[in-house]
Amino acid sequence: MAVSLVKGGNVSLTKEAPSMNVALVGLGWDTRVTDGQAFDLDASVFLVGENGKVLSDSHFVFYNNTTSPDGAVQHQGDNRTGEGDGDDEQVKIDLTKVAADVKKLVFAVTIHEADSRKQNFGMVSNSFMRVVNNDNGSEIARFDLSEDASTETAMIFGELYRHGAEWKFKAVGQGFAGGLAALATQHGINI
């Protein structure tokens, strides 16, 4: 049975699934309020070092750069509508291939063209991040975001990080105004 996390909680993926080599991170959401405008949310991953900054601009994985330089992190494609049940976007991570100088994978979701469309996370419900053992399909951990983020246009859902020889999953749920640009700047992306 999957571990259910609350904001700030963490779990050792290594202890919960000792034989897992490849993790699948699923991110999902539903739009609850819309004025008819298209609603496009995008998942992205920042591969950061000890200083909390990306190792290079190519260590930012998203719909226009779907694979990390080491090949370990692969975005599975952009879902432009968020329709349907289950994961809206997925990222596959080969934990055995993540470069040693990458200390943390930060998973974020942003609203595309949020300002011009007057959209924010207050219009989004049922958001979640889950980690699945890709080798056997079993869900290891899940974080259901519950806070109302009525002004934020970007959200860090969670992180996979190294702790000694272990990989851990931390539930973050931190919102940001300023969308993708604000998140990218915070993580050292040159925009």
Curated annotation (Swiss-Prot):
The keyword Cell membrane does not apply. Belongs to the CAPAB/TerDEXZ family. Keywords: Plasmid, Tellurium resistance. PANTHER family: CAMP-BINDING PROTEIN 1-RELATED, GENERAL STRESS PROTEIN 16U. It comes from the Bacteria. The keyword Cytoplasm does not apply. Not known; seems to contribute to the tellurium resistance (Ter) mechanism. This is Tellurium resistance protein TerE. GO terms for biological process: response to tellurium ion. Residues 77-88 have a biased composition (Basic and acidic residues). Residues 69-88 are annotated as: Disordered.
